[in-house]
Amino acid sequence: MDQGGTGAPAHTAATYGQYAGTWFAGHSPVYAAWAAHVAATASLAALIATLPPDKRQPNLVFAATQFLGCPDADPATWEAFLRGNWPAVRTVVLGHRTQTNEPRRCATLLPVFGLIAARTRRPLALIEVGPSAGLCLLPDLYSYEYDGVTRLGTGAPLLRCTTTGTPPIPAAMPRIGSRAGVDLNPLDGTDPEMVRWLEALVWPGQDGRLATLRAALATLASPGTERPRLVAGDLNERVAELVADVPPTHTAVVFHSAVLAYLPPGQRARFAATLATLDCHWVSNENFFLDDSGATVPSAHGDRFTLALDGRPLAHTGQHGATLDWIR
């Protein structure tokens, strides 16, 4: 059953140990404990290793158990739930993707969108790679508070962010002319089952994130909101099509957050090469730095992301948008 070879359980255990110590530590004690338990329990790592390689991620497996009703329990209780419901867990994992839709990341993206808008003086045509339900395509419909001061917007949710350095927080909301995205499996943020999955992807103990998600979903579902155009397909196959659809009166901005980590290095390099041929700006917010040649440089900042514009790093950001450390 080990689809990844004899080394798959050990690799799975190591991955869960890394998540426990780097990504979950200090953010979700429940997930940190579950991941550490998998790392320390060979039979549990072996069970998870029977999943296809791209379906073994802690976020996906844990979210599947949450989706099926597992409480935020101690590791032993979680393990019993996983084993007792393994066929159902496996079905959920195989039928879903890690499509966390984190609207708080708009607080770290907005200054870069503002920079582009100020330079081009045209409405932005936002094109998100891996948009999930498209909540990050609605930045102008939210409101923002940087360092305890409300600066922009009147909509919900209110996105709070602390900063260091001198980030170029815009004085006015950038004009958004159009919104589009490409995802292997776009989600309908108004469908109750898809909403349940999005909520299951929020880590235990992060009630603020859950409230923000629900407020953003309410904005998306509002009768006055024009829904983003979300197309199904491979990002490398369809991003050029979306850029080509942008009228000359708009500035195309292709952006992504926590998406390219799920691609093999060759596909990342292909994506960078494709963007280099397109008439667009490129905003990357990932846990590694992908330069304009497609080379991947791991982040040296633990659980931080590197925010870059057109292959040039500008800031380090909190993985869920709570912090912005400007380095330029």
Segments predicted by a language model, with ranges:
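Non-catalytic accessory regions outside enzyme or core folds
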Residues: 1-50
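Class I SAM-dependent methyltransferase Rossmann-like catalytic core
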Residues: 21, 35-123, 135-143
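Class I S-adenosyl-L-methionine-dependent methyltransferase module
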Residues: 51-56, 70-73, 100, 115-232, ...
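Short His-Asn-centered micro-motif
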Residues: 129, 231-233, 255-257, 285-286
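Short amphipathic alpha-helix with an adjacent loop that forms part of the alpha/beta core around
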Residues: 238-247
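A short SAM/SAH-binding and catalytic strip from SAM-dependent methyltransferases
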Residues: 250-265
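C-terminal substrate-binding/active-site "lid" region of AdoMet-derived donor-dependent transferases
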Residues: 261-311
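Structural signal for terminal/edge beta-strands and the immediately following C-terminal loop/tail
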Residues: 303-328
